[in-house]
């Protein structure tokens, strides 16, 4: 089992004001604990995440240290075949509001490698894990995750 994690999860994790902050915190805790097996991002998601965090003045350096350099995330560098398939997916959906080339890459990679897709993006044609994740947890699990945040000195 393995999962591809989309940019919005990391943005929500670092952005305390984001509507999905607690969803992201719970997803990251469960992901790091191994709930979905090996964790992946594509080089496109990595680019998008680093750029967004830096642009929004959020800790891109902490993301690099905590997720990339630590080995928590495995990076999938897309090859020509994946890029060509993603271009076709993107072309077919070019007028769909909010659907990006990075989304097309993610969809192709998740489908080909049979990865769970962890994202808040409802435009994917594949099922996703993400929206209302925090609400789906029972009270004891929410308390456990909140205790982890307090222990680490993180607002939640």
Swiss-Prot record:
Question: Which Gene3D superfamilies does the record associate with it?
Answer: 5'-nuclease (3.40.50.1010)
Binding of Mg(2+) occurs at 6, 103
Q: Which cofactor does it need?
A: Mg(2+)
Q: Which SUPFAM superfamilies match?
A: PIN domain-like
UniProt cross-references to InterPro entries, sorted A to Z: PIN-like_dom_sf, PIN_dom, VapC20-like, VapC_family
Tell me which Gene Ontology terms the entry assigns under biological process: rRNA catabolic process
Which stretches make up the PINc domain? 4-125
PANTHER family recorded: 23S RRNA-SPECIFIC ENDONUCLEASE VAPC20
What does the similarity note say? Belongs to the PINc/VapC protein family.
The protein's name is VapC ribonuclease AF_1683
Tell me the lineage of the source organism.
Answer: Archaea, Methanobacteriati, Methanobacteriota, Archaeoglobi, Archaeoglobales
């Amino acid at each position: 089992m393995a999962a591809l994690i989309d940019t919005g999860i990391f943005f929500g994790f670092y952005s305390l004001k984001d509507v999905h902050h607690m969803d992201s915190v719970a997803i990251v805790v469960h992901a790091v604990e191994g709930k979905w097996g090996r964790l992946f991002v594509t080089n496109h998601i990595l680019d998008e995440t680093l750029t967004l965090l830096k642009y929004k003045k959020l800790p891109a350096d902490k993301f690099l240290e905590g997720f990339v350099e630590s080995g928590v995330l495995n990076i999938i560098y897309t090859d020509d075949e994946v890029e060509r398939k993603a271009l076709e997916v993107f072309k077919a959906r070019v007028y769909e509001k909010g659907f990006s080339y990075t989304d097309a890459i993610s969809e192709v990679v998740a489908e080909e490698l049979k990865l769970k897709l962890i994202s808040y993006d409802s435009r994917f044609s594949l099922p996703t894990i993400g929206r209302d994740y925090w609400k789906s947890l029972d009270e004891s699990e929410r308390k456990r995750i909140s205790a982890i945040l307090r222990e680490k000195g993180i607002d939640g």
